[in-house]
Amino acid sequence: MQLLPRLRNLLVCLALSVPLAAQSLPKLLVTITDENAVAVPSALVFLQLSPQALPLRCETDFSGTCQFTNVAAATYQLRVEKAGFYSLLLPTVQFGATSNIDVTLSHIQEIREVVNVVESPPVIDPAQVSKQEEITGLDIINIPYPSTRDYRNALNFIPGVVQDTTGQPHLEGAQTYQALTLLDGFNITQPANGLLLARVSTDALRSVTVQTSRLSAQYGKASGGLLGLNTGIGDDHYRFATTNFIPSFQHRKGFNLDKVDPRFTLSGPIRKGKMWFFDAADGEYDNVIFSELPDGADHDAVWRIGNLAKIQTNLTSRDILTGSFLINHFHDEHFGLSLFNPIEATPVEAESAYITNFKESHFFSGGELLEVGFGLVHYGVNASPLGSKPYFISPETTGGNFYFFSQTRARRWQGLANLYLPPAQWHGQHEFKFGVDIDRLGYDANFERQPISFLREGQSFPPTGTCLTQNPSPCSRYSIFPGQDNTFEHNVETSAYAQDRWLITNRFLVEAGLRFDWDEIVRRFLFAPRLAATYVLDDAGKTKISAGVGITFDSSPMFLLARPDAGTRLDYFFNPDGSLTTPPTVTSFSADTDRLRAPRYLNSSVSFEKKLPWDIYATTSFLFRHGTGVFVYNTLKGTPGGTFVLQNTREDRYHAFQLNLRRNFRKTYGVLVSYTHSRSTSNQVLDFSVDSPIFTAQAPGPYSWDTPNRLISWGLLPFFKLPWIGPLDLGYSAEARTGFPFNVINDQFQLVGLPGSQRFPSYFALNLHLEKRFQALGFYWAIRAGYDNITGRQNPVAVNNDIDSPQFRTFSGFDGRAFTTRIRFLGRK
């Protein structure tokens, strides 16, 4: 009888001893910050008892901390890695019952000589749920590509991003305005048309991040995905660098100036340990000469200036204030000059951009982080003809003076706040995040248009009169633009979100979020749920699978809503004998916002990551995006001409299979290869406007940037040592893809067949450069020389698509082989 009470007491003692033992087990708290005492989230921390032991692993949260628990007191090796930073190794870490370790990670700087630092290698990140691609600032500097002064050209070498013939990027087949472009966390997308117009010096970028699926609920207003531009800031060391400060020359129609495109960066402390600055200035002057044009009409002058100024101050150990101001100015004397568009038919184009933002980050004593910020963007574009001569278009060329004068202004005021809560424990670890975003957008425009005469094959423009006064008329079509007026549009956008990162185990992570959007145009409450997960299949962390599905909505595009105020078009059509066919056709546009609903996209994807032998990292992804109720202009009866009404009848479809292989070597050497098979199509692909002369009904087809098969590769590799020169670096980039589609029209600009029925030839370009880094005069330098399109393949960017022209399918605008050089002054060590 006494055995049972004794057994009961023993069990109670054992039960009480378990939590006591757990509490006595050692804990290690690791805090990661950068050179400016800013918390570094998503850094991987490895704790290893011996080289043979399997390392323990944790990832820092928003506060830059992570904790190891249930670890015996001993001597360990601690390793910290994060993309964009140098990895850090602490060979001996000793701790007892509790220990705190503060670690400072340094951002990757341009390598000037062999130093005892190693770039963080690519790893399979168990906490990265989104489908994300990233290139670092050093990648942008090292990758050779045409016009390296423009970071937008480097975007073409990010898997999933395609650059169209106008230089605009498209994320996973989406339109440019369907991407959310952030500069250091603030929205800099052009408020009216959504184009990527802001220019930042390539030397100012720390990284460019692209997320196209499984996005956090924090990011909305863009069905295509997120394009994040992250710039640098100074530290406690003064740094100065400059690139291309020596003009280049060209031997084209004689020996002439080619261009001057210097870039300067200066950074350092205002008060060491407390306040820092960063300034990146760049400019260019291009003397563009066209060999195929006659002397005296073959020259275009383009100039541009830009400057990014930033400042950061740590008000206290818990308060960080940052601010920046970006200015851009661009001027082109003969915008669009080409063989088909002579000087007198080109406009003078001037563009400007002013972007500023401020953000404060405050850590509360309870572990919460609050971010509040304000941003302002202002874009302006002016296009002016060179005179008042009548403008005409023939099957082979244009003439007269450009018909269009425009003056547009677009603005956005943005206020945002994000609240991060400390991790909570419930069946795993939860990291909750909440936020709001309020934007006010404005757009105003002034347009003036002159008539356009469309000439028949073999006809010349009449020296006097117009297409309507000549009998027989030399024209196939004549367009005039009555009813032009000034345009003003505005909108207010309100957004809020809630996000939970649920770490169920060290290998299983689920992200669930809900986003709310509302604006003054659609005036509907929009709820966008998101769900994604990632699972690491092995203890070594070498295999991972991720999947997710989510709803996204586009912001209301003001350029479409402003189209009714842009005026109307009156089209006269002529028979082959020069006589008028029927009464003129009136083309006008209308938009009833009360009948509109927000376009809705379903985005789903799955990715598989695997570390292969020889340290090759492979990623395979499948992505599907389906958009319904997308804005499009169409006539009510689906016939050419008439009143075009803004409707929700467009459906977009995009699917893609992607395979990426990446291998990093010592220092910053590495190679990337990416293949994508995709299709980007719509049931109503045409974009009608008063300035679009295409005359047809809506029709299905591929988008103009659709490229079903695409292979890109780039890398930086050590080259052979050459006599008297020493070791060299070999940089390359390559792209091979299916040619873009184009429409076929007749001499009246009526669509022949379906949109995108024909394609440009297959595209291939290989850029190959050699670079030498050396020390001279007490400073570090880097000189690069090489060829863009070294194979000399003729890749056209324009085509005669008039089926009635003898030059139908004549391609032009070839980019031939080009020898380029670059010199960089890197300062002192």
List each model region and its residues:
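Periplasm-facing N-terminal accessory domains of Gram-negative outer-membrane beta-barrel systems
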Residues: L20-T136, N187-T189
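Periplasmic N-terminal accessory/gating domains of Gram-negative outer-membrane beta-barrel systems
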Residues: Y86-L88, T92-T104, E113-I233, T243-F255, ...
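Transmembrane beta-barrel strands of outer-membrane/channel proteins
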Residues: E119, F240-S248, D279-G283, G323-H329, ...
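Transmembrane beta-barrel wall of Gram-negative outer-membrane proteins
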Residues: N256-D332, V348-V372, P529
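Solvent-exposed loop/turn elements at secondary-structure boundaries
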Residues: A532-V645, Y654, P761
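C-terminal beta-signal and adjacent terminal beta-strands/loops
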Residues: D615, P723-Q748, E771-K829
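Gram-negative outer-membrane beta-barrel transporters
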Residues: T619-N743
